[in-house]
Amino acid sequence: MSAILPGYAELHCQSNFSFLQGASHPEELVTRAGELGYAALALTDECSLAGVVRAHVEAREQKLPLIIGSSFTLQAGADAPPLDLTLLAQNREGYGNLAELITLGRGRAAKGQYLLTPADIEAPAGDNAHLRGMPDCLAILAPPPGLAAERLAEQARWLAAQCPGRAWIGLTLLHHCRDDLHRAAVEHAAHASGLPIVALGQAQMHRRSRKPLHDTLAAIRTGRSVGQCGYDLAANAERHLRSRLRLASLYPAQALAQTLAIARRCTFSLDELQYEYPDEIVPAGHTPASYLRQQTYLGARQRFPEGMTPAVAAQVEKELALINELRYEAYFLTVYDIVGYARSQGILCQGRGSAANSAVCYCLGITAVDPARGNTLFERFISKERNEPPDIDVDFEHQRREEVIQYIYEKYGRQRAALTAVVISYRPRSVLRDTGRALGVDNGIIDAVARAHQWWDGKKEMLRSLAACGLDPASRVARQWAELAETLMGFPRHLSQHPGGFVISRGKLSRLVPIENAAMPGRSVVQWDKDDLDALRLLKVDVLALGMLSVLRRALALAGQRRGRPLALHEIPPDDDATYDMICAADTIGVFQIESRAQMSMLPRLRPRQYYDLVVQVAIVRPGPIQGGMVPPYLRRRQGREDITYPGPAVRKALARTLGVPIFQEQVMQIAVDAAGFTPGEADALRRSMAAWRRKGGVDKFRAQLVGGLLARNYTADFAQALFRQIEGFGEYGFPESHAASFALLAYASSWLKCHEPEAFLAALLNSQPMGFYAPAQLVQDARRHGVRVLPADVLYSGWEASLQDAPGAARPAVRLGLNLVKGLREDSARAIEQARVRRPFADTADMARRAGLPRQALDALAAADALRTLAGHRRLASWQAAASAQSRDLLREAVIVETETPALPAPSEGQTVAADYRSVGLTLGRHPLALLRPQLAARNFQTAAVLNTYPNRRLARACGIVTVRQRPQTAKGTIFVTLEDETGPINAVVRPELIERQRRELLDATLLGIYGTWQSVDGVRHLVAQRLVDLSSLLGQLSQDGLAAASRNFH
């Protein structure tokens, strides 16, 4: 039958990257077009190219010609209707013009919007003059059905004049009651303008079954329920990709033939895009290659004062030769320049990821991992056979990274530099809220269901939540809600900005990819995300934020002040026994990477005693090694409970440092090369497939080559198959060795500071919030258990940030909390207090309020936080004086006023004080809340953490504490790990799926949780395996009328 059907190319198709309009993914549209036998498909999202790379990749798989285009609504003024225009790129020049037009429209409007007028096509001004008539683009007028015939004819004549020989008028027939009138109007306009008519489907769905979702998106877009949308809903489901048989019955043959004529003229492919690196960093008299060589060897003299070893020197030369062959010098120099700027400003930074495999990056100061210390594999970073740009990730202090970002913008300009986009997609709770509102569900039910839903919950749990909220799961509304939520999950909602992935080009970046405004002032983003850039092999530079770098710089500065001389990162002793003793004891709250529950459970078993042990420690607690079954054999071998064996010398070479067990991706690559006969490029392709095998089954295509290569070199079939199973495990997230090596340096440095400079480390952690695994309350409690004296925030002594304060006769300083912990206090108010205090001490609260010019809100916040205690007494007195002081007028700011006598108000109880501390500062320096509740808890036989830690293995036990962390790792098969805190320390608990099923509410809702279970203590790892849970949060109400506001860290 296909032989007698007319050919057809859909020239107006919108995906779900026309946010809240299209109801299908780009890949779904491409696949469906291929199934229907279309000659081509044009993706024409509204003023956007955000979905074209996904469509391009799928079209390449389907061998379907993809036309790159975009649709626009041009605002013609108050007296004229908008003009709906579709533009299609004929060639590379046309594509660049299209991308620039999108950039122009997006740049004029707030995030997520655009503004274009007919004048932007007819007579664009200034730098955009070359866009006049949109050269090398084909233009199709796509009028709505209700547009008056004369208005349509007027628009057609205008378009014919602007794009002579490149313009059409589109006819869209969707089985509307006015199709005949619309067709007549189009024919009239075509006759009046001389434009040919072309068939347009204006598809927004790949199948008609998406119509309910299409209606739901319209409701979400307009902020109403589906029942209230009326004519804003499509009248039927015809805006899907229709069969050619159906199209032939609707459209004139000539209109269908025109689609093929247009498709033949549009020959552009995204594969034609060529990226050019910035080149202005190279000074006169140098080529990029000579300048990179010069800077590399200058850096080598600093990195290796006694000279490079022959192996390192050979590695540098090998890398420089390959970089030169692939013409990547400008990329390395761009990153070198950015890192150089950061260092010149005193901003701590460090490269990580596969770049740490590079000796050149180490010499340039981009990375901190000495290639002589590691088992680097340069092919993990750059491969000639891969023929794609390397990826250099550089971490900067999170509180100063914006300075680096603005430097890049200033150096290269907004026309040449922009951040990578991140596609924000629907997640469970946002899906439930939006679809529930669209269906008209009561807001109370929506809130209850959304709050109860967790990221791992499926349709069954949602229906159970509906039942708990009084909605019949079998009802039509419940079923629709569940089905729509399931379909909408993962749909793109809007574009956001990447944490720091920059695209920088030699010429106009807007001719490569459209640029639009970000929500944050002073930022702009391209319309593609990192996966899009990778798919097209386009370069990006990752300027990332890392909180621990802020902590390290601050802690080193504070420690240097205490010691009376500067302390630098490289001066930290590398093999400190006390530091490793602390690490082995899992005493790592607050340190980098090894502070999580899983890492702390592993530390007593792995017992790191040197740097490379930390590299393994950082990497081994990852889904990849866990799923691949690498962890148990490594631990057994490390603990001497299993022989260390190697099937052959090539395997020994790759795995000797990890006791014969593959932990890192680089090791798999090396085995593939040395033991299975892979080329370095093939090995890297294997590595890349590891991350994609669950999605695409890509790793399977290497099974025969890997297993066959091992068998051909006399390795056993058992070993070959076992190795491949381990490789499959890397399909889950795992660290490359180079990445783990970079992070291990920071893990050790932060551990050393915690061990030897605990006061400076705590102050730095508090001043670098928000970051890390633990809230300030847990960090302070842990520090105090280690003997650190912590003083409260006080307006007479505190600055905005925490500081070190000496005390007469004390061997070590105390940590004075900063005013930044006071909830509701602005930084400018705290700075004003500091400045006024320098001039002369405050006489009382009123004196401080007048001289610092504090508003009533600031005074109330300080009183609530007990930061006025030295001036005014306890909280109630302070609140009274704050209220009285707020009446002072600005003109009396410097006058001395005699206040009326403050009434004798009773001091709050200890419990009230503790509760108020948590509400106003987020922590307490008084007794722990559970110390106050201990008599009630002891009556129920709940033991403290200190007592539990003395229990033998498999003893029945009871614990109670404030929930500080809930975690559900994907590798834990549904188990949730809970951390409680009492007055003596943390308690780790394990909650199995069957108990979660029975006591979900207690587990997820309790602030104070009691756990009955069995204590486990093996190899220094201790936890309570839960058998019953009790929500004891009501006990906290005894501390004060308002209870205790303590937030846990849930499932982050």
UniProtKB/Swiss-Prot annotation:
Gene Ontology CC, one term: cytoplasm
Coiled coil location: none
Any one Gene Ontology BP term: DNA repair
Keyword Metal-binding in record: no
The keyword Cell inner membrane belongs to this UniProt entry's keyword annotation: no
EC number of the protein: 2.7.7.7
Keywords associated with the record: Cytoplasm, DNA damage, DNA repair, DNA replication, DNA-directed DNA polymerase, Nucleotidyltransferase, Transferase
Record-linked Pfam families: DNA_pol3_alpha (PF07733), DNA_pol3_finger (PF17657), HHH_6 (PF14579), PHP (PF02811), tRNA_anti-codon (PF01336)
Gene3D superfamilies named in the record: 1.10.150.870, Metal-dependent hydrolases
Name the record gives this protein: Error-prone DNA polymerase
